[in-house]
């Protein structure tokens, strides 16, 4: 029974976690190339600008600070790191990846660490861009800003990676416990069978209670 539960838990984790990481990877990838994170409006000239970590505006005006602030530089580094780690996590979780990365008993722990680190990188990129907007408002004066959908979508992507990492971590913590319980149960059953075999070899017969215990153990198995 424990073995079946172990397999069911592994099947659940290896089914839901790739879905979470794949969706999180797509979210981070789309948000990273989308420039409209924040909408800025100059109250004096009524000019409208859009701000993101990367400047790739086409038909709209992007805010292009020169030189680049430390917030933008670090934000780009963390966001690109999140994209790379999200891709690695998603690739490892795919079924065909077992040919390249053999699944060991520590893989759940490694995947949990990568998932948490991916979420942390994306969160730091979000915070650094927010600090850039705050510094911009203090420097340029009257600027109105409104947060656009990439902020909320990226926050949801961070949540997905936290959930995926938590599932992998729980799997890593629970499986050894089930393995120990299964081993203990198997040792008790082997000890009981050995006792009955020794008793029969000496010419004795097991009591009715021992027979009932053996039948019950076989039924459970």
UniProtKB/Swiss-Prot annotation:
Major localization listed first in the record, in broad terms: membrane
Subcellular localization(s) per the UniProt record: Membrane
Database matches in PANTHER family: TRANSMEMBRANE PROTEIN 225, TRANSMEMBRANE PROTEIN 225B
Name the record gives this protein: Transmembrane protein 225B
Keyword Transmembrane on entry: yes
One Pfam family hit: TM225
Key words of the record: Membrane, Transmembrane
